Amino acid sequence: MATLEQMLDVGVHFGHQARKWNPKMAPYIFGERKGIHILDILQTAILLDKARVYARRQAASNGSFLFVGTKNQAASIVRFAAERCQKNDRSQAHYVNHRWLGGMLTNWPTMQLCIKRLLELESNHERGGFQQFPKKEAAVARKQLARLEKHLGGVKNMTGLPTTVVIVGQPQEMNAVRECEKLGIPMITMLDSDCNPLLTDIGIPSNDDSIASIELVMREITKGIEEGQWIQKEGREEATIEIEWFVVEPTPVEKPLVIIEPPPVEKPVLSK
Protein backbone atom coordinates (compact mmCIF):
# COMPACT_ATOMS: atom_id res chain seq x y z
CA MET A 1 0.00 0.00 0.00
CA ALA A 2 1.30 3.46 -0.92
CA THR A 3 2.31 5.58 2.06
CA LEU A 4 1.12 9.11 2.79
CA GLU A 5 4.62 10.38 2.07
CA GLN A 6 4.60 8.75 -1.37
CA MET A 7 1.22 10.31 -2.11
CA LEU A 8 2.47 13.74 -1.09
CA ASP A 9 5.60 13.33 -3.21
CA VAL A 10 3.59 12.77 -6.41
CA GLY A 11 1.02 15.49 -5.64
CA VAL A 12 -2.03 13.28 -5.16
CA HIS A 13 -3.48 15.94 -2.84
CA PHE A 14 -3.55 18.83 -5.34
CA GLY A 15 -7.00 19.69 -6.70
CA HIS A 16 -8.12 22.27 -9.24
CA GLN A 17 -8.47 26.01 -8.84
CA ALA A 18 -11.04 26.75 -6.17
CA ARG A 19 -13.35 28.51 -8.65
CA LYS A 20 -13.59 25.32 -10.74
CA TRP A 21 -14.59 22.98 -7.93
CA ASN A 22 -17.71 20.85 -7.57
CA PRO A 23 -19.35 21.70 -4.20
CA LYS A 24 -20.26 18.03 -3.75
CA MET A 25 -16.55 17.37 -3.22
CA ALA A 26 -16.52 19.54 -0.07
CA PRO A 27 -16.30 16.57 2.36
CA TYR A 28 -13.09 15.44 0.66
CA ILE A 29 -11.34 18.81 0.61
CA PHE A 30 -8.89 19.62 3.37
CA GLY A 31 -8.56 23.32 2.59
CA GLU A 32 -7.39 25.90 0.11
CA ARG A 33 -3.92 27.25 -0.64
CA LYS A 34 -3.10 30.01 -3.10
CA GLY A 35 -6.42 29.50 -4.85
CA ILE A 36 -5.94 25.73 -5.22
CA HIS A 37 -8.02 23.17 -3.35
CA ILE A 38 -6.08 20.65 -1.26
CA LEU A 39 -7.65 17.19 -1.06
CA ASP A 40 -7.83 15.29 2.24
CA ILE A 41 -5.00 12.81 1.74
CA LEU A 42 -6.04 10.72 4.75
CA GLN A 43 -9.36 9.96 3.06
CA THR A 44 -7.43 9.28 -0.15
CA ALA A 45 -5.38 6.61 1.63
CA ILE A 46 -8.46 5.00 3.21
CA LEU A 47 -10.50 4.93 0.00
CA LEU A 48 -7.56 3.80 -2.14
CA ASP A 49 -7.15 0.84 0.18
CA LYS A 50 -10.88 0.14 -0.12
CA ALA A 51 -10.59 0.20 -3.92
CA ARG A 52 -7.62 -2.17 -3.85
CA VAL A 53 -9.41 -4.65 -1.59
CA TYR A 54 -12.54 -4.45 -3.75
CA ALA A 55 -10.48 -5.06 -6.90
CA ARG A 56 -8.82 -8.05 -5.27
CA ARG A 57 -12.15 -9.57 -4.29
CA GLN A 58 -13.63 -9.03 -7.76
CA ALA A 59 -10.59 -10.54 -9.49
CA ALA A 60 -10.62 -13.50 -7.11
CA SER A 61 -14.24 -14.08 -8.13
CA ASN A 62 -13.18 -14.07 -11.81
CA GLY A 63 -14.60 -10.59 -12.41
CA SER A 64 -13.46 -8.46 -15.34
CA PHE A 65 -12.28 -4.84 -15.38
CA LEU A 66 -12.51 -2.04 -17.93
CA PHE A 67 -10.08 0.87 -17.50
CA VAL A 68 -11.30 4.14 -19.05
CA GLY A 69 -9.12 7.23 -19.48
CA THR A 70 -9.00 9.10 -22.77
CA LYS A 71 -7.26 12.36 -21.83
CA ASN A 72 -3.58 12.71 -22.65
CA GLN A 73 -2.28 12.28 -19.10
CA ALA A 74 -4.20 9.03 -18.59
CA ALA A 75 -4.24 7.29 -21.99
CA SER A 76 -0.93 5.43 -21.81
CA ILE A 77 -1.29 4.67 -18.09
CA VAL A 78 -4.70 2.97 -18.32
CA ARG A 79 -3.42 0.91 -21.25
CA PHE A 80 -0.37 -0.18 -19.29
CA ALA A 81 -2.52 -1.02 -16.24
CA ALA A 82 -4.88 -3.20 -18.28
CA GLU A 83 -2.08 -4.94 -20.18
CA ARG A 84 -0.29 -5.67 -16.92
CA CYS A 85 -3.40 -7.44 -15.62
CA GLN A 86 -3.78 -9.28 -18.94
CA LYS A 87 -0.52 -11.16 -18.36
CA ASN A 88 -2.38 -13.55 -16.08
CA ASP A 89 -5.72 -13.55 -17.89
CA ARG A 90 -6.29 -11.72 -21.19
CA SER A 91 -10.05 -11.79 -20.75
CA GLN A 92 -10.02 -10.15 -17.31
CA ALA A 93 -8.77 -6.60 -18.05
CA HIS A 94 -9.52 -4.21 -20.91
CA TYR A 95 -9.17 -0.51 -21.67
CA VAL A 96 -10.54 2.44 -23.62
CA ASN A 97 -7.94 5.18 -24.02
CA HIS A 98 -8.81 6.97 -27.25
CA ARG A 99 -12.50 7.85 -27.44
CA TRP A 100 -15.55 6.36 -25.81
CA LEU A 101 -17.90 5.15 -28.53
CA GLY A 102 -21.55 5.74 -27.75
CA GLY A 103 -23.21 2.45 -26.81
CA MET A 104 -19.93 0.74 -25.96
CA LEU A 105 -21.74 -1.02 -23.11
CA THR A 106 -25.44 -0.29 -23.57
CA ASN A 107 -25.31 -1.49 -27.20
CA TRP A 108 -22.87 -4.33 -26.57
CA PRO A 109 -24.25 -6.76 -29.23
CA THR A 110 -23.43 -4.22 -31.97
CA MET A 111 -19.98 -3.65 -30.48
CA GLN A 112 -19.40 -7.40 -30.55
CA LEU A 113 -20.01 -7.39 -34.31
CA CYS A 114 -17.43 -4.61 -34.73
CA ILE A 115 -14.94 -6.54 -32.59
CA LYS A 116 -15.58 -9.66 -34.67
CA ARG A 117 -14.80 -7.67 -37.81
CA LEU A 118 -11.60 -6.34 -36.19
CA LEU A 119 -10.42 -9.85 -35.33
CA GLU A 120 -11.18 -11.06 -38.87
CA LEU A 121 -9.15 -8.22 -40.40
CA GLU A 122 -6.27 -8.85 -37.99
CA SER A 123 -6.21 -12.54 -38.84
CA ASN A 124 -6.35 -11.80 -42.56
CA HIS A 125 -3.55 -9.25 -42.28
CA GLU A 126 -1.31 -11.63 -40.30
CA ARG A 127 -1.75 -14.32 -42.97
CA GLY A 128 -0.84 -11.85 -45.71
CA GLY A 129 -4.37 -11.89 -47.07
CA PHE A 130 -4.34 -8.18 -47.94
CA GLN A 131 -1.66 -8.83 -50.56
CA GLN A 132 -4.15 -10.91 -52.52
CA PHE A 133 -6.65 -8.02 -52.68
CA PRO A 134 -6.72 -5.48 -55.49
CA LYS A 135 -4.72 -2.40 -54.54
CA LYS A 136 -7.79 -0.26 -53.79
CA GLU A 137 -9.53 -2.95 -51.69
CA ALA A 138 -6.33 -3.60 -49.74
CA ALA A 139 -6.04 0.11 -48.91
CA VAL A 140 -9.65 0.21 -47.71
CA ALA A 141 -9.12 -2.90 -45.57
CA ARG A 142 -5.95 -1.48 -43.99
CA LYS A 143 -7.72 1.79 -43.23
CA GLN A 144 -10.64 -0.04 -41.63
CA LEU A 145 -8.28 -2.20 -39.58
CA ALA A 146 -6.40 0.86 -38.31
CA ARG A 147 -9.64 2.62 -37.35
CA LEU A 148 -11.10 -0.39 -35.53
CA GLU A 149 -7.81 -1.08 -33.74
CA LYS A 150 -7.65 2.53 -32.59
CA HIS A 151 -11.14 2.51 -31.08
CA LEU A 152 -11.64 -1.14 -30.09
CA GLY A 153 -8.15 -2.58 -29.73
CA GLY A 154 -8.36 -2.36 -25.95
CA VAL A 155 -11.61 -4.33 -25.74
CA LYS A 156 -11.08 -6.93 -28.49
CA ASN A 157 -10.65 -9.69 -25.90
CA MET A 158 -13.75 -8.64 -23.93
CA THR A 159 -16.39 -11.35 -24.25
CA GLY A 160 -19.08 -9.68 -22.13
CA LEU A 161 -19.86 -6.65 -20.01
CA PRO A 162 -17.22 -5.86 -17.36
CA THR A 163 -18.03 -6.37 -13.69
CA THR A 164 -16.12 -3.19 -12.71
CA VAL A 165 -15.17 -0.02 -14.60
CA VAL A 166 -12.22 2.13 -13.48
CA ILE A 167 -12.61 5.79 -14.47
CA VAL A 168 -9.81 8.37 -14.76
CA GLY A 169 -11.03 11.88 -15.59
CA GLN A 170 -14.72 11.73 -14.71
CA PRO A 171 -15.76 15.04 -16.36
CA GLN A 172 -14.33 13.83 -19.69
CA GLU A 173 -15.83 10.33 -19.39
CA MET A 174 -19.46 11.17 -18.58
CA ASN A 175 -20.76 9.03 -21.46
CA ALA A 176 -19.06 6.01 -19.93
CA VAL A 177 -20.34 6.96 -16.47
CA ARG A 178 -23.94 7.23 -17.70
CA GLU A 179 -23.77 3.85 -19.43
CA CYS A 180 -22.38 2.22 -16.28
CA GLU A 181 -25.13 3.82 -14.20
CA LYS A 182 -27.80 2.63 -16.64
CA LEU A 183 -26.50 -0.96 -16.53
CA GLY A 184 -25.69 -0.96 -12.81
CA ILE A 185 -21.98 -1.63 -13.35
CA PRO A 186 -19.89 -0.63 -10.28
CA MET A 187 -17.30 2.10 -10.82
CA ILE A 188 -13.99 2.99 -9.17
CA THR A 189 -13.20 6.64 -9.92
CA MET A 190 -10.34 9.04 -9.32
CA LEU A 191 -12.11 12.10 -7.88
CA ASP A 192 -10.46 15.45 -8.46
CA SER A 193 -11.99 18.57 -6.93
CA ASP A 194 -14.13 19.13 -10.05
CA CYS A 195 -15.74 15.66 -9.96
CA ASN A 196 -19.08 14.42 -8.61
CA PRO A 197 -18.60 11.80 -5.86
CA LEU A 198 -22.25 10.77 -6.13
CA LEU A 199 -21.62 9.28 -9.59
CA THR A 200 -19.37 6.44 -8.48
CA ASP A 201 -19.39 3.48 -6.13
CA ILE A 202 -15.85 3.88 -4.81
CA GLY A 203 -14.35 7.34 -5.20
CA ILE A 204 -10.68 8.07 -4.55
CA PRO A 205 -10.00 11.78 -3.87
CA SER A 206 -6.92 12.36 -6.00
CA ASN A 207 -5.26 14.53 -8.62
CA ASP A 208 -6.34 13.15 -12.00
CA ASP A 209 -4.26 15.65 -13.99
CA SER A 210 -0.83 14.57 -12.76
CA ILE A 211 0.79 11.62 -14.54
CA ALA A 212 2.63 10.59 -11.36
CA SER A 213 -0.60 10.73 -9.33
CA ILE A 214 -2.52 8.65 -11.89
CA GLU A 215 0.32 6.11 -12.00
CA LEU A 216 0.28 5.69 -8.22
CA VAL A 217 -3.48 5.13 -8.03
CA MET A 218 -3.56 2.76 -11.01
CA ARG A 219 -0.60 0.83 -9.61
CA GLU A 220 -2.47 0.17 -6.36
CA ILE A 221 -5.61 -0.96 -8.18
CA THR A 222 -3.68 -3.27 -10.51
CA LYS A 223 -1.87 -4.75 -7.51
CA GLY A 224 -5.25 -5.60 -6.03
CA ILE A 225 -6.33 -7.23 -9.31
CA GLU A 226 -3.12 -9.25 -9.54
CA GLU A 227 -3.52 -10.41 -5.95
CA GLY A 228 -7.07 -11.51 -6.72
CA GLN A 229 -5.93 -13.33 -9.86
CA TRP A 230 -3.37 -15.22 -7.80
CA ILE A 231 -6.00 -16.13 -5.20
CA GLN A 232 -8.35 -17.32 -7.94
CA LYS A 233 -5.61 -19.33 -9.64
CA GLU A 234 -4.47 -21.00 -6.43
CA GLY A 235 -8.04 -21.67 -5.31
CA ARG A 236 -7.35 -20.21 -1.90
CA GLU A 237 -10.13 -19.81 0.65
CA GLU A 238 -9.55 -16.04 0.77
CA ALA A 239 -11.39 -15.79 -2.53
CA THR A 240 -14.71 -16.36 -0.79
CA ILE A 241 -14.07 -14.32 2.36
CA GLU A 242 -16.24 -11.23 2.74
CA ILE A 243 -14.00 -8.31 3.63
CA GLU A 244 -15.27 -5.42 5.73
CA TRP A 245 -13.67 -2.00 5.57
CA PHE A 246 -13.36 0.59 8.28
CA VAL A 247 -14.00 3.64 6.16
CA VAL A 248 -15.21 7.08 7.13
CA GLU A 249 -17.47 8.30 4.35
CA PRO A 250 -18.88 11.76 5.16
CA THR A 251 -22.23 12.76 3.79
CA PRO A 252 -21.77 15.01 0.74
CA VAL A 253 -22.50 18.66 1.51
CA GLU A 254 -24.31 20.77 -1.04
CA LYS A 255 -23.17 24.10 0.42
CA PRO A 256 -19.79 25.51 -0.64
CA LEU A 257 -16.84 25.16 1.69
CA VAL A 258 -16.62 28.11 4.07
CA ILE A 259 -13.66 28.69 6.34
CA ILE A 260 -14.76 30.55 9.46
CA GLU A 261 -12.08 32.64 11.11
CA PRO A 262 -12.13 32.74 14.93
CA PRO A 263 -13.17 36.11 16.43
CA PRO A 264 -10.33 38.31 17.69
CA VAL A 265 -9.56 37.93 21.35
CA GLU A 266 -9.94 41.17 23.30
CA LYS A 267 -7.26 41.97 25.82
CA PRO A 268 -8.53 42.35 29.38
CA VAL A 269 -8.59 45.88 30.76
CA LEU A 270 -6.51 46.14 33.91
CA SER A 271 -7.86 48.49 36.57
CA LYS A 272 -5.40 50.85 38.22
From Swiss-Prot:
Q: Which domain of life is it from?
A: Eukaryota
Q: Name one Pfam family in it.
A: Ribosomal_S2
Q: Name one GO biological process term.
A: translation
Provide the GO MF annotations for this entry. structural constituent of ribosome
Q: Does the keyword Chloroplast apply?
A: yes
Q: Where in the cell is it found?
A: Plastid, Chloroplast
Give the matching PROSITE patterns. RIBOSOMAL_S2_2
Q: Which GO terms describe its cellular component?
A: chloroplast; mitochondrial small ribosomal subunit
Which InterPro entries does this UniProt record tie to the protein? Ribosomal_uS2, Ribosomal_uS2_bac/mit/plastid, Ribosomal_uS2_CS, Ribosomal_uS2_flav_dom_sf
Q: Which UniProt keywords apply?
A: Chloroplast, Plastid, Ribonucleoprotein, Ribosomal protein
Signal sequence range: none
Q: Identify the PANTHER family for this entry.
A: 30S RIBOSOMAL PROTEIN S2 PROKARYOTIC AND ORGANELLAR, SMALL RIBOSOMAL SUBUNIT PROTEIN US2M
Family the entry assigns: Belongs to the universal ribosomal protein uS2 family.
The name on file for this protein is Small ribosomal subunit protein uS2c
Source organism (scientific name): Nephroselmis olivacea
Source organism lineage? Answer: Eukaryota, Viridiplantae, Chlorophyta, Nephroselmidophyceae, Nephroselmidales
